[in-house]
Amino acid sequence: MNKKWKMMVLMGLAATGMMVSAVSAEESYKIGICQLTQHEALEEATKGFQDYVSEKLGDQVTFDVQNASGELSNCVTVINAFVSEDVNMILANSTPVLQAAASATDSIPVLGTSVTDYPAALDLEKWNGVTGTNVSGTSDCAPLQQQAKMIMELIPDAKEIGILYCSAEPNSRYQTDMIRSSLDELGCTAKVKDYTFTGTDDIASVTTTAAENCDVIYIPTDNTAASNAELINNICEPAEVPVICGEKGVCEGCGIATLTIDYYELGQITGEMAVDILENGADVSQMAVRQAEQVKKCYVPERCEKLGISIPDDYEEL
């Protein structure tokens, strides 16, 4: 073998070695995902997140997806396992999961999604849109004043408005306070009363009481209500009481109308934040909590027709 040929072979081997070295040095990431329970909105947010991150990072990323089955103790167990594994990031899908993650670690980046009120969830006294901690994410809060307008627009003669929600969910308590305030600001003269349940054991009895006393029921974005939407519908529909909801998944199960965000889009936005942190070194403590960019009015035609409720032209069918 002549010297020139030997040199070419050596150069080729060196180049190959450099390529192997570059590939082996490519960063890999593990993201732990904990979803509170199984229902459409949360699943769409998880899917949107995974799709976006997978599209951008490909084989560099793996996901450990866990469902807490609606149990707060399971949230803690799952999150603690992620921390022990030293995952690169945690996606906390819902408020209780976010709270568990924020308590478990101050070093692993935590992104929340399907979380309505970050200051309340994290017990932050001052709020300027960033947490200043290892936590950020996306909020699923649709404009609550517009939801209040929807109640008044669709059921203008209501004498009593019932707000049905789980008292154990901070998101729901926040939305209830905001809806009350918005109804008052809009000059609503109806009596507004809370009907709170503590979990699945008393949701039927509380819903029955609400249906017996109210002209319309409002359900905010509430995980327990979402998981029991069919039960709520089986009580409210025979009682001919319309239900207006804070998100699409609940509305499909028991409502007549909703002003909703796109949870898949919300997950995609959260995924964009994740890639920025993992690949670009963005500081999670300085990342502003983001929201879905679009909301839309939707209605369920079959239920509206049964109740004789006229729907304006700017609503879309569910």
Residue ranges of each PLM-predicted region?
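Short, low-complexity disordered leader/linker segments with a strong preference
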Residues: 1-30, 55
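An alpha-beta-alpha
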Residues: 31-33, 49, 136-186, 283, ...
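Short beta-strand elements in bilobed, periplasmic/extracellular small-molecule ligand-binding domains
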Residues: 50, 55-75, 134, 180-200
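Beta-alpha junction/loop-to-helix N-cap segments that form part of ligand/metal-binding clefts
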Residues: 65-125, 222-246
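Hydrophobic alpha-helical segments within soluble ligand-binding/sensing domains
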Residues: 118-160, 261-282
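Pocket-lining segment of extracytoplasmic ligand-binding domains
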Residues: 171-241, 247
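Flexible loop/turn connectors
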Residues: 250-302
